From Swiss-Prot:
The keyword Iron does not apply. This is 3-aminoacrylate deaminase RutC. Its EC number is 3.5.-.-. The gene is rutC. It comes from Enterobacter cloacae subsp. cloacae (strain ATCC 13047 / DSM 30054 / NBRC 13535 / NCTC 10005 / WDCM 00083 / NCDC 279-56). Involved in pyrimidine catabolism. Catalyzes the deamination of 3-aminoacrylate to malonic semialdehyde, a reaction that can also occur spontaneously. RutC may facilitate the reaction and modulate the metabolic fitness, rather than catalyzing essential functions.
Length: 128
């Protein structure tokens, strides 16, 4: 199955051997996305809402670069560092998925950079 690598202009260069997204058989797989600027610095330190918005905007850019929209998202894997941020993260998350919600899970864990509060990996079916 052929795949296309998705690297939107202006996104950070991954700090490990992966790309922001891949497209195969009409499915976009978005790698775990952290609240990084283009130089891999954590943005909006101690602000779970702003970090979540930044992460979801980055995911949106990857999906749109592949030819899809956020309405095409079918699954999200959410990783958070502290349950106290759960409500704030969900508030912003709901803004990006106002209609039919995708399936998802959410777990608390440590992330690759201590100031990052949220990481999201996404699957979207764009039908191409």
């Amino acid at each position: 199955m052929p795949k296309s690598v998705i690297i939107p202009p202006g996104t950070s260069t991954p700090i490990a051997p992966f790309v922001p997204g891949t497209l195969a058989d009409g499915v976009v797989y978005v790698s775990g996305t952290l609240p990084f600027d283009k130089d891999n610095n954590v943005v909006f330190i101690n602000d779970p809402k702003a970090q979540t918005r930044h992460v979801l905007e980055t995911i949106k850019t990857v999906i749109e670069t592949a030819g899809g929209t956020m309405e095409d998202v079918t699954f999200n894997s959410i990783f958070i560092t502290d349950w106290k941020n759960y409500a704030a993260i969900n508030e912003i998350y709901a803004e990006f998925f106002p209609g039919d919600k995708p399936a998802r899970f959410c777990i608390q864990c440590g992330l690759v950079k201590p100031d990052a509060l949220v990481e999201i990996a996404t699957v979207a079916h764009i039908g191409k």
